[in-house]
Amino acid sequence: MRKQIDFSNLILKKTPNQYLCLPKGFNSLSKPHQLTSNYDVSARDLQSAWYKTVIKHRSVNCIFNDENSLKSEFTQLSRVFKFIDIISVEFIEKSHNLSSLAIYSRSVLGYYDFNVNRKRVIYWLKIFNRETKLLIK
């Protein structure tokens, strides 16, 4: 089993082939590229809804999904060259029925990714918000 990402201590590489999203106010060594929203649902329910939405996408596989740690990890093959990208997600319980998520998407190979990781995360969040219709605060 791969070591799971510790979002608080994550230090981004000096390469452009990665994309990090964190909840507002999340304490991390790295500055996120984007902030994530809050959802009116428990972190466990958010994890379940995220899994159901993301797993339907082209060449996505779940390689880790743990309800105790509230962490999941997915892989997706790039469209053109079939390189593997890794997407780590942590579901964060902010209070009773209020949660958010941290996402780190990155390429395994190469230096440039033509913004694939950024586009993926933005798209997944857009689809997730549209499909789940969870109230966002």
PLM regions: where:
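Ser/Thr-rich, low-complexity intrinsically disordered terminal regions
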Residues: M1-K137
